[in-house]
């Protein structure tokens, strides 16, 4: 199969490109950032010319659904395959989602159930995976062991810089701010079920919108006010608060490395290591950590984030917050360890630091499960099978 891969510097693009080659695809790449994902005329022109110059192309592919790519594919009546790796993904609110040329694959089942009604024949559920063959090829040197060996590591943002709520909380009336903070605190006590959008009323969401500096969506978008408030304001605030509290609690009892570019001034006990390149540093960090921590972003309501597959695919022992879909693919306690509160997490960290044999066996089981069922190669073959059998 010949396809055009529209790359825009998503962290998982290289792994997907590697998998396309391994399964025998002929890939033509359009590799540049998109200034306006909805209407950039230069990008539209460049992609249309690339489609015209490659008459044997069967489809166009991108990470995340991008409306300007959908527009080009509609012009040529060529299938546009997209695989969304983010929640929320605002572009799914675009009216271009309804194009019959789209084949949209979503990794979070609740996200899939929310958006599927807008194009029932063209939106599918597909979990994420990892570039296991590349992770396998990475050997950790003695020098890298000295640099990266640690008891516990977390790689990722604290979400302080991404949390819109922080920039608007002082614009809210006291009663609204109190209600929002109460929702966040209540959500933080519930693992495995995100109820924020369910409990917010339409009236409260509209009032919230009126009080803050709202970032309006493009004209041809559906404006889901409740969804945006729940995910990008309250959901991100939950993520930020949970990560800071969890890392603080861990670092008060254990030796922990944190790889992040976020502000860490509120985390005095953690070993702040700076940023970590996803392809050239993260695999070594995973392989050198006794415990790899996953804390899922709250707007990912049921699905498995990309990070879980990367951690397990690199052979890491993983402790993760509970997500509803995890038991569908991995056996808790055999392939991965799950926690349902900070005290539970601290107890499991202590246990598995003291029980190396169990820790190593669980990491091996998780790796084998990813190798057998959850590689990018297998996921892309599933994707092609779906569109071929339509």
Regions found by a protein language model. Give the residues of each.
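Structural motif
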Residues: 58-59, 79, 291, 317
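Short, conserved loop/helix-junction motifs that constitute active-site signature segments
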Residues: 73-75, 96-99, 145-147, 251
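N-terminal pre-catalytic "stem/leader" segment of glycosyltransferase-like enzymes
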Residues: 1-77, 228-232, 255-256, 376, ...
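Active-site proximal beta-strand in glycosyltransferases
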Residues: 73-88, 103-106, 128, 153
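Nucleotide-sugar donor-binding catalytic core of glycosyltransferases
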Residues: 4-12, 121-300, 323-326
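Short acidic active-site motifs
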Residues: 46, 69, 92, 280-281, ...
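Catalytic binding pocket for nucleotide-activated donors in carbohydrate/polymer assembly enzymes
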Residues: 4-7, 11-14, 18-23, 28-37, ...
């Amino acid at each position: 199969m010949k396809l055009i891969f529209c790359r825009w510097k998503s962290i998982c693009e290289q792994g997907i490109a590697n998998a396309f080659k391994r399964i025998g695809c002929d890939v033509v790449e359009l590799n540049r950032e998109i200034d306006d994902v909805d209407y950039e005329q230069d990008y539209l022109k460049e992609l249309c010319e690339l489609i015209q110059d490659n008459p044997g192309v069967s489809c166009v592919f991108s990470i995340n659904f991008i409306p300007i790519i959908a527009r080009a594919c509609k012009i040529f009546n060529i299938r546009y395959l997209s695989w969304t790796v983010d929640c929320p993904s605002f572009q799914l609110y675009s009216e271009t989602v309804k194009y019959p040329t789209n084949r949209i694959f979503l990794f979070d089942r609740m996200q899939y159930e929310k958006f599927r009604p807008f194009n029932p024949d063209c939106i599918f559920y597909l979990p994420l995976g990892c570039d296991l063959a590349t992770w396998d090829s990475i050997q950790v040197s003695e020098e890298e062991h000295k640099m990266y060996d640690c008891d516990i590591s977390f790689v990722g943002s604290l979400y302080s810089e991404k949390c819109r709520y922080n920039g608007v909380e002082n614009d809210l009336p006291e009663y609204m701010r109190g209600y929002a903070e109460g929702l966040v605190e209540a959500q933080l006590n519930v693992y495995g079920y995100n109820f924020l959008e369910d409990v917010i009323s339409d009236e409260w969401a509209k009032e919230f919108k009126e009080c803050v500096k709202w970032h309006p969506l493009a004209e041809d978008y559906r404006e889901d006010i409740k969804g945006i408030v729940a995910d990008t304001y309250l959901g991100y605030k939950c993520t930020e608060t949970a990560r800071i509290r969890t890392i603080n609690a861990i670092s008060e009892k254990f030796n922990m490395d944190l790889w992040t570019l976020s502000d860490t001034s509120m985390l005095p006990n953690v070993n702040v290591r700076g940023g970590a390149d996803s392809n050239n540093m993260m695999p070594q960090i995973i392989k050198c950590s006794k415990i790899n921590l996953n804390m899922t972003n709250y707007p990912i309501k049921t699905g498995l984030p990309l990070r879980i597959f990367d951690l397990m695919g690199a052979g890491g022992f993983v402790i993760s917050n509970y997500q509803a879909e995890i038991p569908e693919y991995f056996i808790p306690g055999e392939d991965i360890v799950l926690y349902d509160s900070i005290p539970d997490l601290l107890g499991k960290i202590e246990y598995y630091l003291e029980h190396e044999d169990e820790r190593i066996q669980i990491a091996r089981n998780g790796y084998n499960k990813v190798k057998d069922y959850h590689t990018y190669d297998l996921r892309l073959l599933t994707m092609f099978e779906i569109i071929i059998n339509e």
